[in-house]
Amino acid sequence: MGDPFMKKARQVLFVIVILNIYLSIVSWSDITSATMETAERILIDFNNTDEKENWQIINDDVMGGVSQSEIIFNDTGTATFQGRISLENNGGFASTRSKSHSYRLGGYNGLHVRIQGDGKDYQLRVRTDNRFDGISYRYRFATQPETWMNIRVPFSEFVPVFRGRIQSNVSPISPEQIQQVGFLISDKQAGKFRIEIDWIKAYK
């Protein structure tokens, strides 16, 4: 039989080693989490009641269409953009966007959005000026019905467009100049639509 003292010592040593490994993993997880938090910045938080005054609706009625939409601020701290797309009178789009604000995103690499959709395709849009019309930068994404998604979009993947047409002679987006953020549905997707947005962040 072995020495009982040595056996006990080995058991204690084993416990100490396992404990140190566990603490190392926990500490690294905390560091990683903290790094992720500092690498992202919240741009739009619908828990903030001030956001209710910062969003506007722009539909195809500006060109004679009859599509309808609204943005609803939920008690859960999210916002719902919903409505109905009509193709009558050559219409077919609805959108919502934030009012002009200088976000000062120099040094950031892209946008991170948490969203729940309805299975239709949407566009995340940003603008670098405060004009009602003009150049915007879009990123197309598909949604899954009643499924929350995290969408990370590098600024390099935003495409400059004017009234739905890609502009090849426009400079790439300048993060430092971004002033408006929003969502748009088009592409002849007639009928009801609905997306729910939790937040919009910028990431490095």
Question: Model features per residue range: what roles?
Answer:
Residues 5-14:
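Bacterial N-terminal signal peptides that target proteins for export
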Residues 7, 24-204:
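Beta-rich carbohydrate-recognition modules and glycan-binding surfaces
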Residues 15-24:
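Bacterial N-terminal signal peptides
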